[in-house]
Amino acid sequence: MTASEERLAALTSWHADWSGLRVVVYGLGVTGFSVADTLAELGASVLVVASRADHERAMLLDVIGAELLLQADLSAPPERLTAFGPELIVVSPGFHADHPLLLWADQQGIPVWGDIELAWRLRDKTAPPGSGNSPADWICVTGTNGKTTTVQLTATMLLAGGSRVAPCGNIGVAVLDAIRDPQGFDVLVVELSSYQLHWINRNAGGEVSPYAAACLNIADDHLDWHGSLEAYAAAKAKVYENAQVACVYNRADEATLRMVEETEVVEGARAIGFGLDVPGPSDFGIVDGILCDRAFLDDRLHSAIELTTLEELREAGLAAPHIVANILAASALARAYGVEPWVVRDVLSAFRLDAHRIELVRIEAGVSWVDDSKATNPHAADASLRAYPSVVWVVGGLFKGVDLDGLVKRHAARLRGAVLIGADRDLLRSAFQRHAPGLPVVEVDADETEHVMPTAVRLAAALVRDGDTVLLAPAAASMDQFSDYAERGRLFQAAVNEYLGGGADDGSSASRPGSGG
């Protein structure tokens, strides 16, 4: 091990000597800025390399004492980068593993960390009061879909149970920002993308060891980044590595069980399954409409603890099957951390989903209009479609290299019609021609963002019948026509209310599926 490698391996604390370490940060999004800000605070010499940058963040770099190299073409290492002589590179999640600058780093023998490894090494920065300077525990959550809902639920349960908790990671708050919060936390609930997981546990001294971890599901997604489903799944599996207490997996997704079986964990860590069927010992599931914990009780062979009921979830608008699965996963993580069953039940009675997640916009003339713009891949759209018996499906966008045939074939029988939006309509059109040739399929060919949803709503209204649901579940990313999934959802809701007349408060009030509103 070289002197430089020895120094990096020893950097496992906020209180270590980071001063003068030459670090290059790739990217200046939320994650990249948090990395640069943290390293500058530690006294490292920081150069940020990016192809584009938000003006405010670029200005702030100068304030914190970090240098910015902004260059549109990063197909080769810029001269300033090579002259800087980095001892370490910290990469933002958006950089592909085969990016030319990362290939250059590998050729030069320069270690590469992700933001999660850096945060893990620095996790002792702020310990909660009375902890004896012990850093916060980490509960890590990944999966193709349901991560954010599960993280929010888990964090809310932990908070209600008396813990000081921060939901962070891919949910929007950088983990490095959470570990630097001066108040300190007992536990971080960390949402991890496959991009972030790709970079963890690669370097001595930076091995993440979560208190508990969950992979909710695995399906085709981000294959353009990872190259194959196998590589994508391998990245997701890293969430379980070195787990201390619980590995929560999906009984309906055998890939997640294989991950647990094949992963090295801390001795004594348990595998905890969740599913919508009857649970076995050490699992969470449903018996006669009752959500049960058969994992965290003394007599789990013969009894179970009631958490809530499907009827109560239906009243709260949380009864869609994929949401129930998220609830069971979150309950397993919270119970692993010691949250009492009554706390779980109280949280579920008050919890509400974020906007654009199976959000009922209007019910008019027997037709439900539902916004699930958050369904940004086929797996999420599949879960959404399963919640409704007869659907006019508004679908399309950027498909990120995934296969659509299975999704269309699986749901053809429940479709009244389809309205295609987005840049990759030809892929959708072909899938419908192969698997639903008799289905009415219409297309929105508007290029201007403001015209897409009004046209889609008008076309959907022409196809729909009494009792149907018009469902925006795009199964695709939004960046071809919208700034993000939230804008796509907002414009859909506005178009629905404009077409039907009045606002969301006229006629039937907006609520969640099954809320009785």
Curated annotation (Swiss-Prot):
Record GO cellular component, one term: cytoplasm
Reactions performed catalytically: UDP-N-acetyl-alpha-D-muramoyl-L-alanine + D-glutamate + ATP = UDP-N-acetyl-alpha-D-muramoyl-L-alanyl-D-glutamate + ADP + phosphate + H(+)
Residues the record lists as binding ATP: G143, T144, N145, G146, K147, T148, T149
SUPFAM superfamilies according to UniProt: MurCD N-terminal domain (SSF51984), MurD-like peptide ligases, catalytic domain (SSF53623), MurD-like peptide ligases, peptide-binding domain (SSF53244)
Main location as per UniProt: cytoplasm
Alphabetized GO MF terms: ATP binding; tetrahydrofolylpolyglutamate synthase activity; UDP-N-acetylmuramoylalanine-D-glutamate ligase activity
EC annotation from Swiss-Prot or TrEMBL: 6.3.2.9
Pfam families with a match to the protein in the record: Mur_ligase_C, Mur_ligase_M, MurD-like_N
Coiled-coil regions, chain positions: none
Pathway: Cell wall biogenesis; peptidoglycan biosynthesis
Cysteines joined through disulfide linkages: none
Subcellular location, record wording: Cytoplasm
GO biological process, one term: peptidoglycan biosynthetic process
InterPro entries linked to this entry: Folylpolyglutamate_synth_CS (IPR018109), Mur-like_cat_sf (IPR036565), Mur_ligase_C (IPR004101), Mur_ligase_C_dom_sf (IPR036615), Mur_ligase_cen (IPR013221), MurD (IPR005762)
UniProt keywords, alphabetically: ATP-binding, Cell cycle, Cell division, Cell shape, Cell wall biogenesis/degradation, Cytoplasm, Ligase, Nucleotide-binding, Peptidoglycan synthesis
Entry similarity comment: Belongs to the MurCDEF family.
Function: Cell wall formation. Catalyzes the addition of glutamate to the nucleotide precursor UDP-N-acetylmuramoyl-L-alanine (UMA).
Protein name: UDP-N-acetylmuramoylalanine--D-glutamate ligase
Native source species: Leifsonia xyli subsp. xyli (strain CTCB07)
Lineage of the organism: Bacteria, Bacillati, Actinomycetota, Actinomycetes, Micrococcales
Name of the gene encoding the protein in the UniProt record: murD
